């Protein structure tokens, strides 16, 4: 006679085996650019719903205390001559990348403001909630040739939540990150220190510590095709002199890149790096990117402004360039794919969307650890809230 519970365990094992076989029958999504070359889809002008800050200890604050202000060097003065190596590594406090934050900070904002959203909880029930960086990866996927990605998706109270999962390859690459690459990462943050002040009209202070725990994040609402979006992204600074003082139109993205000396170098820059800059800035409606070009010694010798809406002009006639319509059409197709695939409303159920360059987006299904990402404090608080969140958003949303 079998011991009590043995049969039940065997049944559970069989269910688990069946569960693990499910991905083989799930659909996939192709990513070739030629499939998405139609007209540019509808994309609602992003509007800022609110913001939050993360302090030097990475603690959340529902305000703008971490916001910095754009303060470039005088136009008629000498060249910038910023030493991006200054303070490395002595005045550098990098964020602990082993801590997987998932959507937690954004979810805290949603929890605090869910009843103030235009359209109410019903709008949220039809929306996709994620980080801007996750959407950026989707936009660039048709042209990406090196790095794959994984996105975990769960549906809860109608809302689709997307949270990135670090791929094994990305983790191995991060843990083996060479010293030069770590220093280059520091240089990007150091450039921000040279270009930003703590107060409007103030002067930058590059003598302080570079602490990458600190962040100011904008929370935005938009719609791509028929997909309402609520997403958040880190903002480098606000330009007090911007023609439009309404966020996100007054925000500025800061970037660094190596100096270019040949047409071939510029062509490669436009094809690859500028694509990522465009995607990152277009999604939240940031109007321009200010780039500092550094020499081999790590000094910024020149600054150049790239208006977001003009970036595509640099590759418009390049057969190996990128097309904004392809990027946005693929993102819209992925959102439709995810919405139709993730149908069960269960915060502990995860559909893991995986992609490697050259292949389609595939799906596997998982329950609980290690892929479940909606925290219990969020699920419990939202569950205790309004009883019915089934309203479908109207097209105007």
UniProtKB/Swiss-Prot annotation:
Cofactors needed by this protein, per the record, are: Mg(2+)
Q: What does this protein's UniProt record list under function?
A: Decapping enzyme for NAD-capped RNAs: specifically hydrolyzes the nicotinamide adenine dinucleotide (NAD) cap from a subset of RNAs by removing the entire NAD moiety from the 5'-end of an NAD-capped RNA. The NAD-cap is present at the 5'-end of some RNAs and snoRNAs. In contrast to the canonical 5'-end N7 methylguanosine (m7G) cap, the NAD cap promotes mRNA decay. Preferentially acts on NAD-capped transcripts in response to environmental stress.
Q: Which GO terms describe its biological process?
A: mRNA catabolic process; NAD-cap decapping; nuclear mRNA surveillance; nuclear-transcribed mRNA catabolic process; nucleic acid metabolic process; RNA destabilization
The protein's annotated catalytic reaction(s) are: a 5'-end triphospho-ribonucleoside in mRNA + H2O = a 5'-end phospho-ribonucleoside in mRNA + diphosphate + H(+); a 5'-end NAD(+)-phospho-ribonucleoside in mRNA + H2O = a 5'-end phospho-ribonucleoside in mRNA + NAD(+) + H(+); a 5'-end NAD(+)-phospho-ribonucleoside in snoRNA + H2O = a 5'-end phospho-ribonucleoside in snoRNA + NAD(+) + H(+); a 5'-end (N(7)-methyl 5'-triphosphoguanosine)-ribonucleoside-ribonucleotide in mRNA + H2O = a (N(7)-methyl 5'-triphosphoguanosine)-nucleoside + a 5'-end phospho-ribonucleoside in mRNA + H(+)
Q: Does the keyword Nucleus apply?
A: yes
- Into which family does the record put it? Belongs to the DXO/Dom3Z family.
| Residues that bind Mg(2+) 1 | 192, 236, 253-254
Which positions does the record annotate as the modified residue Phosphothreonine?
392
Cofactor: how bound: Binds 2 magnesium ions.
- EC number(s)? 3.6.1.-, 3.1.13.-
What coarse category fits the chief subcellular location reported for this protein?
Answer: nucleus
Residues that, per the record, bind Mg(2+) 2: 192, 234, 236
Q: Name one Pfam family in it.
A: RAI1
Any one Gene Ontology MF annotation carried by this entry is:
magnesium ion binding
User: Could you tell me what this protein is called?
Assistant: Decapping and exoribonuclease protein
The positions annotated for binding substrate are 58, 101, 131-133, 217, 234, 255, 280
**Has the keyword Nucleotide-binding been applied to this entry?**
yes
Keywords, A to Z, come to: Exonuclease, Hydrolase, Magnesium, Metal-binding, Nuclease, Nucleotide-binding, Nucleus, Phosphoprotein, RNA-binding
Q: Which organism is it from?
A: Rattus norvegicus (Rat)
Q: Where in the cell is it found?
A: Nucleus
Enzyme group, top EC level?
hydrolase
Q: Which residues carry this modification: Phosphoserine?
A: 394
InterPro entries, per the entry: RAI1 (IPR013961), RAI1-like_fam (IPR039039)
Annotated Gene Ontology cellular components are: cytosol; nucleoplasm; nucleus; plasma membrane
